[in-house]
Amino acid sequence: MGKEKTHINIVVIGHVDSGKSTTTGHLIYKCGGIDKRTIEKFEKEAQEMGKGSFKYAWVLDKLKAERERGITIDIALWKFETAKFYVTIIDAPGHRDFIKNMITGTSQADCAVLVVACGTGEFEAGISKNGQTREHALLAQTLGVKQMIVACNKMDSTEPPFSEKRFEEIITEVKSFIKKIGYNPATIPFVPISGFNGDNMLEPSANMSWYKGWSVERKEGNASGKTLLEALDCIIPPQRPTDRPLRLPLQDVYKIGGIGTVPVGRVETGVIKPGMVVTFAPQNVTTEVKSVEMHHESLPEAQPGDNVGFNEKNVSVKDIRRGSVCSDSKNDPAKESKSFTAQVIVMNHPGQIGAGYTPVLDCHTAHIACKFAELKEKVDRRTGKKVEDLPKFLKSGDAGIVELIPTKPLCVEAFTDYAPLGRFAVRDMRQTVAVGVIKGVTKDDGSSGKVTKSAQKKK
């Protein structure tokens, strides 16, 4: 074993019939963690079902069905390798919680792969007003997925097949709309592929001799290549934010006999280590960390991405709960958010949203009702420019800047300061009706808080 490869997360987006499953299935099948036995089983079933042409999508359909039924799938199935990376596909749309997962940031994607279908009429349907191509791309941008790869799929079904003219026509159109939502086309590889036949997936295709390859220009270094796999290999790996102040939203708080209170959660930014004096918001409780554990082993320090449990002195289960945020009391400690301003995009609300609307917000691990106190402005969701001041309502498809007031104590942050604590989903009627990114927060100065004895000594 040489040096471990870097882990990166991708999200695969695009219109419903663009071939996301086939393309993803192909990568997992050829470069991934599915063993030969499973593949043979799938192939046999596909043949018996008359899907003899064996679409790679079959692999994904099987996995999805298991995922939907709540069977935990061997997660290796959603991974594949490139020369440089272990790639995890963190979600594929079509999964009902896709949008919620993307926002509450079960994991943050490092790159989005936008799949567009090049068949006659197919591309047009996907990019039309009702298509999902734009919505998914806009979501990725809004939620801070900075890198993108565009896979122009189904090149085998253009007229004539593998048409250079059609490819050029499509990338011109895609470049124009992704530029409008805030991506720079010069940094994006455009790869003509057939996810089904494998053209330009792992090896350059003989069917598209006209294709000279993709190239990107970016400050981290230029890159070029011919295949989708090479494009994935050129993703810029994320900088894990260890240098930021600590933010650790709690997923649970356990009471363990003989040990005491053990909060559990994922470090989003900064580091946590024994001896640190931490403050929990919004409760404003300050105490000392006795020990930090991951997988039952004690750690000298936990970093972003680590799921840890840690032991606290003199804090009861009543003091803190899921949704509380742990921070370093000496370095920009987290505080209760009295109100916050956010840019929201209304996605599928049957009526309209006006001042006074009070749905539940899912932000990091918190799940709290917040009131839309004021609609400040309506903005063009494609350009972000203001189109109207103090609108009466926002309806599906609209974007706006709003002021929100939590109905119970809550701790959130501006997206630019702490991204994982600065994006949220608005849930109502058992679905995601809007998504938002927090622009600014009015914080409580938190003068009245509880400080344990050990924390006072440390001061």
UniProtKB/Swiss-Prot annotation:
Originating organism: Oscheius tipulae
Protein name from the UniProt record: Elongation factor 1-alpha 4
Region described as G1: 14-21
GO cellular component: cytoplasm
Alphabetical keyword list: Cytoplasm, Elongation factor, GTP-binding, Nucleotide-binding, Phosphoprotein, Protein biosynthesis
Domain tr-type G stretches: 5-242
Keyword GTP-binding: yes
Source taxon at top rank: Eukaryota
